[in-house]
Amino acid sequence: MSRLLPLLRSRTARSLRPGPAAAAAPRPPSWCCCGRGLLALAPPGGLPGGPRRLGTHPKKEPMEALNTAQGARDFIYSLHSTERSCLLKELHRFESIAIAQEKLEAPPPTPGQLRYVFIHNAIPFIGFGFLDNAIMIVAGTHIEMSIGIILGISTMAAAALGNLVSDLAGLGLAGYVEALASRLGLSIPDLTPKQVDMWQTRLSTHLGKAVGVTIGCILGMFPLIFFGGGEEDEKLETKS
């Protein structure tokens, strides 16, 4: 950190990249995010008189996407060491194939390949949608019939709490759903790097995810079969 502080003092709060007007512009205090809080590095003359902005993104500036250096860095830091190693190997392999086929004209994906891409992306999201909707319905119903009667919360509030439980469960079950989908024997579609970047492939990918989530959410409504109207009538009688 002691080596980075002189460099951070020479950068503005908006960017760490040198610009053409960086030398002529005055140097406002920089902000250093140290994990536990924000540390203001004020210039020798004292603190500025203007308002201070907390955070690394100024107002109305969008968050960094994955196609930027900051977004890619944030994504890499969120991975485990084994995941980073596997990602690095696959990136090297993918780039070597892309360089070898750079001058070759890649044909568009065939309808069979597009169908395979569609199915490959739809199956995991069927599991995601199924678990999300089923857990939300079961948790929301039990919350409404237990805590809802005691505290007198509405049905929408119970559904919101059920959605909270479903989201928390999804954080831990996402890896198991992906592992189960990989055991079905669906390997990665055999496409060249140029074919992966074509609009037909991306369209099939997004359609597969959308259809998979839709089917999964519809299948996840099956707990409604076991919840009849008697429980609702009992709740209304208890409230009255």
From Swiss-Prot:
Its main location: membrane. Coiled coil: none annotated. The chain crosses the membrane at residues 111-131, 143-165, 210-230. Keywords: Cell membrane, Membrane, Mitochondrion, Mitochondrion inner membrane, Transit peptide, Transmembrane, Transmembrane helix. One of its GO terms (cellular component) is intercalated disc. It is found in: Cell membrane; Mitochondrion inner membrane. Residues 62-110, 166-209 are cytoplasmic. GO terms for biological process: cardiac conduction; cardiac ventricle development; regulation of cardiac conduction. Residues 1-61 form a transit peptide. The keyword Mitochondrion applies. The keyword Transmembrane helix applies. It comes from the Eukaryota. InterPro entries: TMEM65. It is a multi-pass membrane protein. Predominantly expressed the ventricular tissue (at protein level). Residues 132-142, 231-240 are extracellular. Pfam families: TMEM65. Essential for maintaining proper cardiac intercalated disk (ICD) structure and function as well as cardiac conduction velocity in the heart. Its association with SCN1B is required for stabilizing the perinexus in the ICD and for localization of GJA1 and SCN5A to the ICD. May regulate the function of the gap junction protein GJA1 and may contribute to the stability and proper localization of GJA1 to cardiac intercalated disk thereby regulating gap junction communication. May also play a role in the regulation of mitochondrial respiration and mitochondrial DNA copy number maintenance. Monomer. Homodimer. Interacts with GJA1. Interacts weakly with DSP. Interacts with SCN1B. It is linked to Defects in TMEM65 may cause a mitochondrial disorder characterized by a complex encephalomyopathic phenotype. Clinical features includ microcephaly, dysmorphic features, psychomotor regression, hypotonia, growth retardation, lactic acidosis, intractable seizures, dyskenetics movements, without cardiomyopathy. This is Transmembrane protein 65. The lineage of its organism: Eukaryota, Metazoa, Chordata, Craniata, Vertebrata. The gene is TMEM65.
